[in-house]
């Protein structure tokens, strides 16, 4: 069973365009109703607003009713009465309104917006600079009034400023240092008394003592560190073998060693290499004296023995006496001895000479006996 519509839609050009022409005609005829509200709007207060709104509503209702009837007839309506007016360029009496550009150019405010600009590159800036300058001037007036108000207002409480540093006089510093040497810490009464003496406040005295204590501690610490560094450098220099280091030379100069050095030149004259020292000369002279005394005692004993054994034969050989009259070399050596010993030697000299003659005689007799 074929489903065919009862009413066929004509597709010819005349069938399609004829309903549109009729609808345009009706819209044009009924569009005159919109002229009344527009005319009333242009006249301003000639008609009350309520009447103008009522007329506008009636005209709009008529256009909508016409469009509804055309839709029911089977022709689709794609335009409104206002749309038709916009499309055709006029809407009843809307064509009487001048364009927006002409209105703005002819108005009083037109030159402010569209005035002649010397530089055509900045058309948009000129339209904003004019009103902005007036606005800025008015704003500056407001700022000036604010400045006057700020002058009259009391300043806001800010952070406390640091006081200027007070320089103490030499007398004050001397008194503070003298008291610091005596006592590093002061009680409140002592602090007040010292402050009154040197014309300072107790707070200033307190702060000065605190700073000076810290200064002394820091100086002592730096001094100890410096001494420790010097000791470390002096002890480690021997292992490193750096004899030319100035720190090591300074340490050697500070602690010299005493070494016996032979004197080669004294008072500009060269000393003898074998010359004994003064102490050694005194010891040698004492030993010589002891040896001389022992030799003299031995000679005295020998002389006594020779006198007791053969004193009669002394005169048998007188030729030997002249030789005995002279001093012997031993006596010449003893002459250099002290005066006390010279007396003893002189008393025994004749005995020594006689003893020597007797010895010579005995030796000669034996020699003669052997030869014969």
Curated annotation (Swiss-Prot):
Q: Which residues bind DNA?
A: 161-220
Q: Which GO terms describe its biological process?
A: anatomical structure formation involved in morphogenesis; animal organ morphogenesis; axon guidance; brain development; cerebral cortex cell migration; cerebral cortex GABAergic interneuron differentiation; cerebral cortex neuron differentiation; club cell differentiation
Q: Which residues carry this modification: Phosphoserine?
A: 255
From the UniProt entry, list the residue stretches annotated as the region Disordered: 219-258, 269-288, 312-340
> Which controlled-vocabulary keywords does the entry list?
Activator, Biological rhythms, DNA-binding, Homeobox, Nucleus, Phosphoprotein, Repressor, Transcription, Transcription regulation
Identify one Pfam family in the record: Homeodomain
Task: State one molecular function term (GO).
Answer: enzyme binding
PTM: Phosphorylated on serine residues by STK3/MST2.
Q: What does this protein do?
A: Transcription factor that binds and activates the promoter of thyroid specific genes such as thyroglobulin, thyroperoxidase, and thyrotropin receptor. Crucial in the maintenance of the thyroid differentiation phenotype. May play a role in lung development and surfactant homeostasis. Forms a regulatory loop with GRHL2 that coordinates lung epithelial cell morphogenesis and differentiation. Activates the transcription of GNRHR and plays a role in enhancing the circadian oscillation of its gene expression. Represses the transcription of the circadian transcriptional repressor NR1D1.
Output this protein's name: Homeobox protein Nkx-2.1
Which species expresses this protein natively? Answer: Mus musculus
The gene for this chain is: Nkx2-1
